[in-house]
Amino acid sequence: MAPKFPDCVEELRAAGNESFRNGQYAEASALYGRALRVLQAQGSSDPEEESVLYSNRAACHLKDGNCRDCIKDCTSALALVPFSIKPLLRRASAYEALEKYPMAYVDYKTVLQIDDSVTSALEGINRMTRALMDSLGPEWRLKLPSIPLVPVSAQKRWNSLPSENHKEMAKSKSKETTATKNRVPSAGDVEKAKVLKEEGNELVKKGNHKKAIEKYSESLLCSNLESATYSNRALCYLVLKQYTEAVKDCTEALKLDGKNVKAFYRRAQAHKALKDYKSSFADISNLLQIEPRNGPAQKLRQEVKQNLH
C-alpha cells in the first residue's frame, strides 16, 4: 500500500527533507512535487516557498543524475526568486555534469558576485576556467554568454539570511581550499601557466594592469607554485590602489620563495599605503638583509622611518 502523504505544504516539505536526508531521493522528489501542487492549488502568492520547493526537488534530480530536470527546476526557482544561491549552485553542477561549461561558468560566477566566499563556487570557477581554456582556447572569455549583474538588493538579501545558510555554503571550506592548494599541476598546466604569465607581463608593459590581473589569475589557476606570478599580480594591485590584495599576493609569493625581493618591496609599499608602518619597516629590513645595497629599498626605509616617529 502506498504511503499516505500529509496534505499541508509545511508537512510535505518537512517529510521531503527527511526522505532526502535518508537518501530516498525519488520519494523526496515526489513529496516536494506534491507540496508544489498543493501550494499552486491554493493560489497562494508565496514565491519564496515555491522557489525553495523547486530548488529542493532540483537537488533530488541532481542526486539521481537527472541533470535536465534539475536545470528545469532550478530555472523555475530562479524565476520566482532571482539570484538565489542554492538553485544557482545546483544548476551550475548540472550544467557541468552535462559538459555545458560556459553555462556552468556563468552560474558559478553569478554566485561569487553574491558571496565571494562560497567555496563550491570558487572550486567550480577554477574547474570551468581550465575546461574552457582547453576547449575554447585563450580567447574563451569572448565566447561566454553574458554574466548577469547582481543587484545590491540580492546581495543584501543573502547577507540578511540566517547564519545557517552561510554555514551550509561554507561547509568543508578549509578542507577544499587545502585540497586546491595542494593540487600538483601537470607539465601541461605548468607550461600553460608560463604562457599566461608572459601575456600578463606584456599587458603590464602596455599599462593595462586590469587585464594583466586576469592573465596572472588564469596562470595561477593552472599552477599556483610560481612566486613571481603572485608578486607580478601584486604590482598590478599596487598600481590600482588595491593595497590589501597586494599584501595577500606578496605573502603568497614569499611562502613560495622566502627571498623574493620584489615581493618584500611591494608588500612594504602596500603596508605603507595602508599606514601600517611597522610591518612596512619589517619588510624593508628583511629585504635589505638579502640585498643590502638595494637603492629603492633604502629610500623607502627613510620615508617609513619618518612616519614611525
Curated annotation (Swiss-Prot):
SMART domains: TPR
Modified residues (Phosphoserine): 160, 186
GO cellular component annotations of the record: cytosol; mitochondrial outer membrane
Cited PROSITE patterns: TPR, TPR_REGION
Main location class: cytoplasm
Keywords, sorted A to Z: Chaperone, Cytoplasm, Isopeptide bond, Membrane, Mitochondrion, Mitochondrion outer membrane, Phosphoprotein, Repeat, TPR repeat, Ubl conjugation
Coiled coil: none
Stretches with biased composition (Basic and acidic residues): 164-178
Spans annotated as Disordered: 161-189
Membrane topology (UniProt): Peripheral membrane protein
Location relative to the cell: Cytoplasm; Mitochondrion outer membrane
Pfam families documented for this protein: TPR_1
InterPro entries: CiliaryAsmbly_MitoImport (IPR051982), TPR-like_helical_dom_sf (IPR011990), TPR_rpt (IPR019734)
Cross-link (Glycyl lysine isopeptide (Lys-Gly) (interchain with G-Cter in SUMO2)): 197
Domain of life: Eukaryota
PANTHER family listed in its UniProt record: MITOCHONDRIAL IMPORT RECEPTOR SUBUNIT TOM34 (PTHR45984:SF2), RNA (RNA) POLYMERASE II ASSOCIATED PROTEIN HOMOLOG (PTHR45984)
Function of the protein: Plays a role in the import of cytosolically synthesized preproteins into mitochondria. Binds the mature portion of precursor proteins. Interacts with cellular components, and possesses weak ATPase activity. May be a chaperone-like protein that helps to keep newly synthesized precursors in an unfolded import compatible state.
Assembly notes: Interacts with HSP90A, VCP, ATP6V1D, KIAA0665, AMPK, and DMAP1 through its TPR repeat.
Family, as annotated: Belongs to the Tom34 family.
Name of the protein described by the UniProt record: Mitochondrial import receptor subunit TOM34
Source lineage: Eukaryota, Metazoa, Chordata, Craniata, Vertebrata
Gene that encodes the chain: TOMM34
